[in-house]
Amino acid sequence: MGVNSSKINDKDRSILSIKEQRDKLLRYSKRLEKIEQLEIDIARKCLRDSDKRGALRALKAKKLYSGLITQTYGQLGNIEQLLSTIEFTLIQKDVMFGLQEGTNLIRQLQADMPLERVGRICNDRDEAMSYVDEVNDMLQGRMSRDQEDEIQEELDSLIREQEDEKVKDLEKPGFTPSTGVDVLPSVPLKNAIPSLDESFPKAASVSNTSSAVVIDEELRKDPVLG
């Protein structure tokens, strides 16, 4: 009975160790996904600031995280499968192999980016930008031509996305693009110039009066009519 109890305890400890590694990998993958999204946000901001090189560097770092995330979830799938199909006779072989694989992956992830660094990157933009530079240096010569092309395609996609947003802004109701020309308001004239119709009768009246005076004087001078 003591032997059976010892075997059961060994089995339980092995399964518990696998579950602990599964949980660690799951937490790590979630943090990597946050940083992956952060790199995309950094790339978008760089494009808004017309910094195409900075955007490209951020997308290269994002590519690295995407690979780590894929690798992590692959190992998580293996561990889940191992936990669901584990049997007592396979403990010494399969469980120890799973433990070793999980341990190796965790060591690799922690060597690339310690957990403490992950927390700082998530909370500090300056730290994130600094890490982007480090990753960019680390990636020199490690990416294939296909990976470089994929990164360039993603950069072009972000550029098109921002251009589409600008077009949508122009199409919004009530949007008036600036012309750079100031339009002066109309000002009513206080002392308007009188029209010809208003001034003409007065001039005619003066002219008629002057003519009557001249005719009367001529009549007085004429001895026949006077």
UniProtKB/Swiss-Prot annotation:
The keyword Lipoprotein applies. Its main location: membrane. A lipid is attached at G2 (N-myristoyl glycine). InterPro entries: Snf7_fam. GO terms for biological process: late endosome to vacuole transport; late endosome to vacuole transport via multivesicular body sorting pathway; mitotic nuclear membrane reassembly; protein transport to vacuole involved in ubiquitin-dependent protein catabolic process via the multivesicular body sorting pathway; vesicle budding from membrane. GO terms for cellular component: cell cortex; ESCRT III complex; multivesicular body; nuclear envelope; vacuolar membrane. It is a peripheral membrane protein. Keywords: Cytoplasm, Endosome, Lipoprotein, Membrane, Myristate, Phosphoprotein, Protein transport, Transport, Vacuole. It is found in: Endosome membrane; Vacuole membrane; Cytoplasm, Cell cortex. Component of the endosomal sorting required for transport complex III (ESCRT-III). Class E VPS protein implicated in concentration and sorting of cargo proteins of the multivesicular body (MVB) for incorporation into intralumenal vesicles. The lumenal sequestrated membrane proteins will be targeted into the vacuole after fusion of the endosome with the vacuole. Belongs to the SNF7 family. This is Vacuolar protein sorting-associated protein 20.
